[in-house]
Amino acid sequence: MTPKEQSPTTLLISSRKDPAGSLIHEELYSFLEDDKRAHSHIRHWHAEERLIYLDGPSLPHDADRILFLSRHASERPRPVLTVHVTGNFGSADYGGRPNTLTPAATGLMHALINRLIIHAPEGYEVMYEATHHGPTDIPLPSCFIELGSTEKEWNDRIAARAVAQAVLDALLMDTSSVIPLAGFGGTHYAQRQTEITKLTRGGFGHIMPTRDIPHLTDALFQDIISSTGAFAIYIDGKSMSGKEERMITGLADKHTIPILGQGDLMRLFDLPFSEYMSIRNLAESLIPGSSIVLHTILEMPAPVSLTIPGELVDEVMKVAAEEFISALDSFPIVHMTGRGKACHPVFITDAAFSGRISDELIHLCVTLLQDRYTCSFEGDSLIIKKLRFDPKKAKNLGIPSGPLYSELMAGKPVEVGDSVIYPEMVMTETEKRIHIPQRQAR
């Protein structure tokens, strides 16, 4: 997310009945006197009534998006700066129409959260709120930014100035790299979604908290996706029942909407989302039901699969799984998990790298095995020689099963009567051959 020379035109709306919104607007005017960059891209409108009761179609339309500057109120007041889009999943208790959602300015919301985190005064929390209240029937993408939660905060000029600075920064940001997400689950104050936006390119539009999931229908799910412009959804599974999570997952599958977790988003880095989806689709065609883990990928315009010997990967995963997976971060590849395996022998990389990557992965596996076993090659076969504890040999030497076996397996000698038994005396060598076709000498 970077500053952008050509920004969308934004309509800033505050209410004369709202002390916090008016104060934020006042501070914005002050900033704009000194910073002319945004003048041509900002329109101002001061409503006479409360914002939540505005009539959407009556609002000015000479802009690309709307940002409402507002106070925040709560039954459990605390100093907080929030961002959310409007709409009602059910009844319209606080403005707007029931069962109606507005288009979300999802990219702007991502920018606002991150700039608020930078500028928030000490003692103020920053977070998304779940979708709630009016106005609805707004034809333009929009969102609220709020300062709360009591008269003390509404009249806090330092906080209002911080919000104004965050707004001005966000309006000038290029948000084209943001991945629009719809969120499901959690409380009204969407802490998990806020954390995701803080750490990743994932930005949320509509967020349906757990309390509103009983309202969810197929039609409403589609409305949430379209009103957000969502590329994918995030499910806070820990905050809901298994039945609720399965219902949401089923709707996502039905409408071919990807489900992304925080880990997925953390690994996306700057990878274009279209390329990420190409990788996911290829992985699904290779191993249905698998999950993907990205490693150091900035772009992958031509994803292809490569396969190395499955026995080789299995051997490495038995003895050096953590080291192997960690080492994959140095490769521009994707590994697949699931269906009983932490790493399948099928990988995805860009076509430009596939030949080299295949050789390097095999070399990595062999190196990790050589650190633990005696390994050699005969032609295209890797020979792995292992020493394993042989209970028959131990028994023949008069060693009773139990703690002494553990000592020997740990490489320690033991005493039986007047005799000292060394570990190598109770070991048997086994040999495993793995065919590695077209292995290149290194």
Swiss-Prot record:
Binds 2 Zn(2+) ions per subunit. Its EC number is 3.1.1.96. One of its GO terms (biological process) is D-amino acid catabolic process. It holds the Pfam family tRNA_deacylase. It catalyses: a D-aminoacyl-tRNA + H2O = a tRNA + a D-alpha-amino acid + H(+); glycyl-tRNA(Ala) + H2O = tRNA(Ala) + glycine + H(+). GO terms for molecular function: D-aminoacyl-tRNA deacylase activity; zinc ion binding. Its cofactor is Zn(2+). InterPro entries: Deacylase_DtdA_archaea (IPR018033), DtdA (IPR007508). Keywords: Hydrolase, Metal-binding, Zinc. D-aminoacyl-tRNA deacylase with broad substrate specificity. By recycling D-aminoacyl-tRNA to D-amino acids and free tRNA molecules, this enzyme counteracts the toxicity associated with the formation of D-aminoacyl-tRNA entities in vivo. Monomer. PANTHER family: D-AMINOACYL-TRNA DEACYLASE (PTHR34667:SF1). Belongs to the DtdA deacylase family. This is D-aminoacyl-tRNA deacylase. The gene is dtdA.
